[in-house]
Regions:
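Bacterial N-terminal signal peptides that target proteins for export
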Residues: 2-13
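N-terminal mature-domain region immediately after signal-peptide cleavage
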Residues: 27-273, 280-286, 292-315, 344-524
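Extended amphipathic alpha-helical segments with heptad-repeat/coiled-coil character used for oligomerization
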Residues: 300-340
Length: 524
């Protein structure tokens, strides 16, 4: 009898141990006992009207991996563009950018964003892309390095205080509230100016749901942990955009990078005050901007001129702020730029005049419909004509015989507006925005037609391409089931198999120039 009782007890204990083993989470690669869940389970991608929409959710490792995996093709193509574009324009090879980004920024961005960046590299590498964390870091920092750090090195070498930066991403933006808008709430709009060979790839919409901090809806670029051209809506009620300060000079190697400050401020702020505090914390001067920010909860808007020596804030609940790459304050102009404020014919000043005209002409009427029209505006106040140019809010430098000398863009340079976004308080409350790819005026850029007329830019042929305009499209934060609800299965990529085969060939050196024509992407 005693033996049978002992036997039963042993069976019970064995069963209990077995059940504990079954429910215990298996060890992950690091042996930390975490669940081996599918890292893509909460993420998806869908393509719509020229935009690539991705939903990312989880901790920094997860959202990084999701990002890299879902945008592997686009990250690979963008990385290859930078490897050829930056040596041509800055005379510095990609390895310089990798080394500089790591030395200047890696330790400063903290554990969370280090993990996210490493995750992006791992996700893309899982799809066959030859990439590591330093590549992703350098991509995030390329504006700060190419347009601020490199000129600062030249300035130091030449001992010339007049050497200026010519930041490539330049924008036309506004924010208005109170008696200036149709219903008294905030309206915000922005379009992005940059070289078309880069800007045609600035077509990502990210619904970011991090494990900590605010949920963010933003436009972005492949591989970026931030928006880059900067248009954000957060579930804390903040609405954020900016325009770059033309001919800003100076770079502080000990300062905090802009891409880190804007991501941290946007993710962890629930008010204008808390957002400003992060943005003004040790700026390095890289990507120095005039920031426009609104709080839909209060209707208040603000502008931050975010330099190194000068951080000047204006706030109102009844008014507007506009941006077209002009430095606002005389002290900033004098101390931190080489900008000629007396020249009213340059692009920044001409667009500033046009913005003020549009605001005053439409006081009390500004809404989403007008915001879209503003961002597509083609009136040139210098030439006094209706035709896209380097002086119009919707920029077309490719047809401008003067180019943009203040940005070092020569005559007919293939650059200008590459996308546009607008939102108001009502949309922001629903975490939603309207966006269009390409020129918001509806004009298409056709590369071969352009190169026939301007063969001096033939060097861009291998890394550039057409940039068609897309219809204005509304985007919102969405659940994974969205695809099933509208009859489309969310895909990891519309051309998974062929892409991975092409990536394998590049890695092995067989047929390295092979390109895979994409199949038509799924449409929502």
């Amino acid at each position: 009898m005693l033996i049978r009782i002992k036997h039963k007890l042993l069976l019970i204990i064995s069963a209990m141990i077995a059940s504990m083993i079954l429910v215990q989470a298996p060890l992950d690669a690091d042996g930390r006992g975490q669940s081996r869940q599918d890292p893509l389970a909460k993420a998806f991608r869908a393509d719509r009207n020229g935009w690539i929409y991705i939903h990312l959710e989880g901790g920094p490792d997860e959202i990084g991996y999701q990002h890299g995996y879902l945008l592997a093709r686009e990250i690979d193509e963008s990385l290859n563009v930078f490897k050829r574009y930056l040596p041509h324009t800055t005379k510095r090879e990609w390895q310089f950018y990798r080394d500089s980004a790591h030395e200047l920024f890696w330790k400063k961005i903290g554990d969370e964003y280090q993990k996210e960046i490493a995750g992006i590299a791992r996700g893309a590498a899982a799809r066959g892309v030859k990439i590591d964390a330093d590549d992703v870091l350098a991509m995030n920092a390329w504006i700060e390095l190419a347009s601020y750090y490199v000129p600062s090195l030249r300035q130091a070498r030449l001992a010339d205080p007049e050497v200026h930066q010519s930041p490539p991403p330049s924008c036309s933006a506004f924010i208005a509230t109170g008696s200036w808008t149709k219903n008294g709430a905030i309206v915000i709009g922005h379009n992005n100016w940059i070289d078309y060979l880069v800007g045609r790839r600035w077509n990502i919409i990210i619904d970011l749901k991090p494990a900590a901090g605010c949920r963010i809806l933003m436009d972005s670029f492949p591989g970026f942990i931030h928006s880059g051209d900067d248009f954000y809506v957060t579930d804390a009620g903040l609405m954020i955009t900016e325009t770059t300060i033309t001919q800003f000079k100076g770079f502080e190697t000990e300062g905090l990078p802009e891409f880190y400050r804007i991501r941290k401020a946007t993710q962890y702020s629930n008010s204008i005050d808390s957002w400003l505090k992060v943005m003004m914390d040790h700026p390095n001067g890289g990507y120095a901007n005039d920031w426009l920010i609104g709080d839909r909860k209060s209707g208040e808007i603000a502008r931050l001129e975010n330099g190194i020596k000068n951080n000047i804030v204006e706030r109102t609940r009844d008014g507007y702020y506009v941006g077209s790459n002009f430095p606002v304050h005389e002290k900033t102009i004098r101390e931190e730029t080489t900008f000629d404020a007396a020249n009213t014919a340059n692009s920044a000043s001409a667009r500033h005049r046009r913005w003020d005209e549009l605001m005053k002409l439409n006081r009390g009427r500004i809404d989403i419909t007008l915001a879209k029209k503003f961002e597509a505006d083609h009136y040139d106040v210098v030439r006094k004509r209706e035709a896209g140019s380097g002086n119009t809010l919707c920029g077309h430098v490719e047809v401008d015989e003067l180019g943009l000398p203040e940005w070092d863009w020569t005559a007919y340079y293939p650059g200008g507006t590459v996308n546009a976004k607008v939102a108001d308080s009502q949309l922001a409350e629903r975490m939603s925005m309207w966006a269009s790819t390409g020129h918001p005026c509806g004009g298409d850029f056709r590369l071969e037609t352009f190169l026939k007329a301007h063969p001096e830019y033939t060097w861009q042929r291998e890394i550039a391409g057409d940039m068609p305009s897309g219809a204005w499209t509304q985007f919102s934060i969405t659940p994974r089931r969205l695809g099933e609800e509208v009859g489309v299965k969310p895909s990891l990529h519309p051309n998974d198999t062929d892409y991975e085969e092409a990536a394998r060939r590049r890695r092995t050196g067989t047929n390295p120039t092979t390109t895979v024509p994409p199949r038509p992407p799924p449409q929502l």
